[in-house]
């Protein structure tokens, strides 16, 4: 069996992490070997980088370019240490965020140069793209209200509503640009309905 890279994307509070875990349980019930991972933080080095990137207690803010480079470093290590080896072993990797997050957050959200971002993504990934990306689409205000009701907000979650709306626009543009790779799922319904829709998509795209 060939390995597959299935990525879950979306704005804060879209439910991607929850749905990813539900998908893992479903795939394992089909006797498929599954690996759960995330960016940033999918390796030991990545965990340290995640702390730097998401901590809201830093004495000095991280510059936008530094932020971009830290995400790229996390991704490069993640691919070499986790993604490539597990794909080679035929495993299904479920990844919480990948390259589209960088385009949406650092490109659209921060307004950084898109050619720079694309070049860094290419260097970090070596051209490794997802087999399918599930974009959980929810209204920005709905997603942020979910996050506020769950836990303390990290540095990114505390950004302005205008920032998060730009991020959402980025995901919308990516969906339009890459229809063969990115599938939109309405994330506003119940967890059960959303999961059913995701399973139908994966059945069609990966198993038919």
Q: What do the predicted segments below correspond to?
A:
Residues 13:
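Walker A (P-loop) phosphate-binding loop of P-loop NTPases
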Residues 24, 141-208:
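NTP-dependent small-molecule kinase module
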Residues 32-125, 197:
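ATP-dependent small-molecule kinase phosphotransfer cores
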Residues 97, 101-169:
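A glycine- and Lys/Arg-enriched "phosphate-lid" helix/loop adjacent to the NTP-binding pocket
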């Amino acid at each position: 069996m060939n390995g597959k890279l299935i990525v879950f994307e979306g704005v804060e509070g879209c439910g991607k992490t929850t749905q990813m875990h539900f998908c893992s349980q479903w795939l394992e019930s089909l006797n498929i070997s599954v690996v759960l991972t995330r960016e940033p933080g999918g390796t030991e080095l990545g965990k340290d980088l995640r702390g730097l990137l998401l901590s809201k207690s830093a004495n000095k803010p991280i510059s936008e370019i530094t932020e971009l480079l830290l995400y790229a470093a996390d991704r490069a290590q993640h691919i070499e240490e986790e993604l490539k080896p597990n794909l080679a072993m035929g495993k299904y990797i479920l990844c919480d965020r990948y390259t589209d997050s960088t385009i949406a957050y650092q490109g659209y959200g921060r307004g950084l140069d898109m050619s720079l971002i694309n070049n860094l993504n290419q260097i970090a990934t070596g051209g490794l793209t997802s087999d399918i990306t599930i974009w959980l689409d929810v209204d920005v205000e709905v997603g942020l209200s979910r996050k506020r009701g769950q836990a303390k907000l990290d540095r990114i979650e505390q950004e302005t509503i205008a920032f998060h709306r730009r991020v959402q626009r980025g995901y919308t543009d990516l969906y339009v640009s890459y229809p063969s790779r990115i599938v939109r799922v309405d994330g506003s319904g119940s967890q059960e309905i959303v999961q059913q829709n995701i399973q139908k998509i994966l059945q069609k795209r990966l198993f038919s």
